Amino acid sequence: VLLAGGVVLLAAVGCHSKTAATPANFVVALNAYFMEHPECLFPQAPRFPYEATDPAEMKPMDALVKEQMLTTEVEPSIHVSRYTPTDAGARAAPRFCYGHRMIASIDSFTPPAQADGFMETQVTYRYTMDEVPVWAESDGMRAAFPAMAVATSGAGMGKVTLASSMAGWTVPD
């Protein structure tokens, strides 16, 4: 009788395993990953003060000036604009992160298959952005940073590989 109860308990625990290929487990894994990997305007951090001569480079920086995240100093003799973070901008500089993804739904996933020594799956998901700062919400910022505009629109979609480990599903490095 005790053995039968143990089997039932083991079966119930197995249904809620962190390693099971379920949308709920994928949501947990992706939210944990994105909490540690925010979305940023500059994936590679620029060095400040940042100097620009090309109008295409200056447009996004000027949007940050308008939002009081940067100041600009123009050197007309050498046609350079020099950008420096303001006190408010210093908190977000140098990458100017604008929040992190929160998974809204798992649309689909491939059957887990062995790859690189782990079970892996491709997950397609929808997300919204969480903790978006006020400076990232203006029309000028959206125009200057189209990828940010899409990410913060509330209708973001993504696709990622997840790998299963003893601790559950994770995004491989």
Feature map (PLM): residue ranges:
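Bacterial N-terminal signal peptides that target proteins for export
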Residues: V1-L3
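C-terminal motif of bacterial Sec signal peptides marking the signal peptidase cleavage site
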Residues: A11-G14
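Bacterial signal peptide processing site
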Residues: H16-K18
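Post-signal peptide N-terminal segment of mature Sec-exported envelope proteins
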Residues: T22-Q44
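Basic amphipathic alpha-helical segments that dock to polyanions
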Residues: P55-T71
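Accessory beta->alpha helical hairpin/"wing" motif in late/C-terminal subdomains of nucleic-acid enzymes
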Residues: T71-R101
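Short amphipathic beta-strand and strand-loop transition segments with alternating hydrophobic
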Residues: G99-D116
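Short beta-strand edge/turn micro-motifs at domain boundaries
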Residues: Q122-A136, G140-D173
